[in-house]
Amino acid sequence: MYGDIFNATGGPEAAVGSALAPGATVKAEGALPLELATARGMRDGAATKPDLPTYLLLFFLLLLSVALVVLFIGCQLRHSAFAALPHDRSLRDARAPWKTRPV
């Protein structure tokens, strides 16, 4: 059904049918001139590799976001009921493996 539209080997008339005017022509051009124009003056892979300021910016944004999350969690725990609970030393003593408990 869609074989004529997606067929890359057919001409432009096979792809679009009678949608174009009879006098209109579609000229297919390769991407080589575009690639040559954009690759002038660049090393191999230089367009895809970020530079040092980009790495520094990402590092500081990540550091800032981690610091904000840690600060937010610390403030939430400081003002919660969890911080007001008394410290139970008996739980810590019961978990100590070096102490022997009476049987």
Curated annotation (Swiss-Prot):
Q: Name one GO cellular component term.
A: membrane
**What are the entry keywords?**
Membrane, Transmembrane, Transmembrane helix
Spell out the subcellular localization from the entry.
Membrane
Question: Does the keyword field hold Transmembrane helix?
Answer: yes
Q: What kind of membrane protein is this, topologically?
A: Single-pass membrane protein
Q: Transmembrane residues, as ranges?
A: 55-75
Tell me the protein's name: Small integral membrane protein 32
Give the gene that encodes this protein. Answer: SMIM32
